[in-house]
Amino acid sequence: MGYTAQAQSLPRKVENVTIKDLYGNPVSLPYYGEKNLLIFYVDPDAYLAMNKNNKFAEELEANGRAAGPEIYGFGILNFPDTFLPKEFLRKICRKRVEKNGATIIDDGAHVFHDKWNLGNCNNKFMLLIVSKEGELVYILRDEITAAGKEEFYRIVDKYRK
């Protein structure tokens, strides 16, 4: 029997995985082992239908407090858990990529989810921080609170400069 991410302590070692880009081509996690990573692992239902952590994601984009020379942020779509049409979602994401240069990749078969043993990610808008040494050092699974924001900024500050 496997165990969920909630039951695992952090930091813990994670490996690079090969999943797909928005066109179905195989890709590895960008800059894995070269930079610290800020990963937005998103069930589209949580973002589009439930508005979970949307404001915080927009805040991060606007204030730049998670940006820096040592960190790279990108999104991974948790497609197996959504009820929304996949091709429609890919089209929306491709437009976002064209508009602002965002990196968004597709975990269409739960490869990332399973290899990193993330537990239940259905209806979640998760934030993960991975060190360039390949250690998962932070997971936000639920909607962020004021105290959670302080903790996130405290942790991300260590990895962005």
Regions found by a protein language model. Name each.
Residues 1-7:
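Hydrophobic h-region of N-terminal signal peptides that target proteins for export
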Residues 29-53:
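Short active-site neighborhood of thiol/selenol oxidoreductases, capturing the structured segment around
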Residues 7-27, 48-52:
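N-terminal "domain-start" segment that seeds a small globular fold
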Residues 20, 102-109:
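Short acidic-hydrophobic, aromatic-tinged amphipathic segments that line or gate anion-handling sites
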